[in-house]
From Swiss-Prot:
Species for this entry: Helicobacter pylori (strain J99 / ATCC 700824)
Reactions accelerated catalytically: 4-(phosphooxy)-L-threonine + NAD(+) = 3-amino-2-oxopropyl phosphate + CO2 + NADH
NCBIfam families according to UniProt: pdxA, PRK03946.1
Lineage: Bacteria, Pseudomonadati, Campylobacterota, Epsilonproteobacteria, Campylobacterales
Pfam families: PdxA
UniProt protein name: 4-hydroxythreonine-4-phosphate dehydrogenase
Any further remark recorded for this protein: The active site is located at the dimer interface.
Binding site for substrate: H126, T127, K259, N268, R277
Top EC category: oxidoreductase
CC terms in the record's Gene Ontology section: cytoplasm
Bilayer-crossing regions: none
EC identifiers of the protein: 1.1.1.262
Task performed by this protein: Catalyzes the NAD(P)-dependent oxidation of 4-(phosphooxy)-L-threonine (HTP) into 2-amino-3-oxo-4-(phosphooxy)butyric acid which spontaneously decarboxylates to form 3-amino-2-oxopropyl phosphate (AHAP).
Amino acid sequence: MAKKKIAISCGDIQGVGLELILKSHKEVSALCEPLYLVHSELLERANQLLDNAYETKTLNAIAIDAPLPLLNSSTIGKVSTQSGAYSFESFKKACELADSKEVDGICTLPINKLAWQQAQIPFVGHTDFLKQRYKDHQIIMMLGCSKLFVGLFSDHVPLSAVSQLIQVKALVKFLLAFQKSTQAKIVQVCGFNPHAGEEGLFGEEDEKILKAIQESNQTLGFECFLGPLPADSAFAPNKRKITPFYVSMSHDVGLAPLKALYFDESINVSLNAPILRASTDHGTAFDIAYQNKANHKSYLNAIKYLA
């Protein structure tokens, strides 16, 4: 069977993205046919910063339509407008290749959201861009590994805005889309307020969540969704024995326990997108950039998911 062709966007070159590409190429190329969306000159510069520890000539790198950012000992680990613009163009090119079926999927290495903002990129991050590009699809950010998956009802929005987003109709649409994509038989849904609202004592959001769960289960014809569960105990060991699938109303409530348990191996997946996309479950790691310290387990797991 032919290996799948996977486009790999470089992420922010001032972080660990290029190190991950270089140090993982042998293992990645055993899993798929990687297509790196980055100028070969940047890979060579990255290798020099890494004491020429890796082979660069065998990598299939495609120059993207963007000016080369500076990459040297003075720029690494710092927010750069040029690097933000470059990482966006690399990502956009990956999507274009997937849309045209020139690749089977895309793997996105971590970007810096502030660098995107400084480069006047009108999207908060990868998922926000995908939601705008594929508006007819209910795209869901799910992070995890085989032991635990968390779907986020809201992702990169201020916590103060989440309450207004929790509406029965929107949540039913989300829950049904999540179940359809994952084919999960049981999904535990975290509550929003302390003690999942204590029957309305702490806000009305959890009553809406309960109603959405009931309507979703009725539509499915079986009791798929459980909850809302008090979020402070939802990820206890006895709860995780029930199912690996969870839904969280907000970003940190779901991802704090996931990353505490499985940070190195988890990945980020875009459910319901018309293209196959996975990413690492970590950021640019500016603090260890070009120190040969980057853990590539999450990156390899993302490639395995796509391949």
